[in-house]
Amino acid sequence: MRVAIEVADWVAVCFNAAVTETYRIPDKRRHPGMGRLGPDLCESNTDPSVAVNLLLSHKVGADQLGEVLLDQRVVRGLGNLYRSEVLWATELSPFARIDSLTERDAIRLINAATTMLRANMQRAECAASVAGKGGLAVYGRNGQRCQRCGETIDCRPFGQHGRMLYWCRGCQQHHDPHQEMQTENMPIDPHPAAQAYLAGLPWNRNVS
């Protein structure tokens, strides 16, 4: 199923949606879950401490950090690309259990996400806190060297929806549970929207 939301200046397209739901703003009872959305880090009036508290109080402590960051009830606005970039910037393992995080970890993570998202709202190309080609540190760079430690960047489908996760085993070891994990030898994120984005990155363009 494909869903498109169109306004005067933008069109947002969702590919391969397993389930879609709609609701009317005047009557949120049609979709009571909308009342439980977390704070949007892109909004200037958002208090980041709210997201910190929601992250630390996540109801299932054994859930992995990389999955929880995409939970809209915890935080909005992050998305798959910045999930990978923010975890790299803070040197946190995406496989860390939520109940292993300290308050300092959560504050660093949310502050990094807030800074990164707001800085990129007006940019044509996404950029992480440490800029490499295209401004990204790990997303779309599987098989390349980490610019911080020199190890090879890995990727694998991760979480309930199988979104592609990019991370560095060498320097993202904080709270890593040291579980054996198999990485996938996949050149790019298989999601259609991600394929279109990654194909346009400088190092993926065909040079004639």
Segments (PLM) and residue ranges:
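Phosphate/anion-contacting hairpin/loop surfaces
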Residues: 1-77, 82-89
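Basic, nucleic-acid-binding surfaces and adjacent catalytic neighborhoods in DNA/RNA-processing proteins
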Residues: 54-208
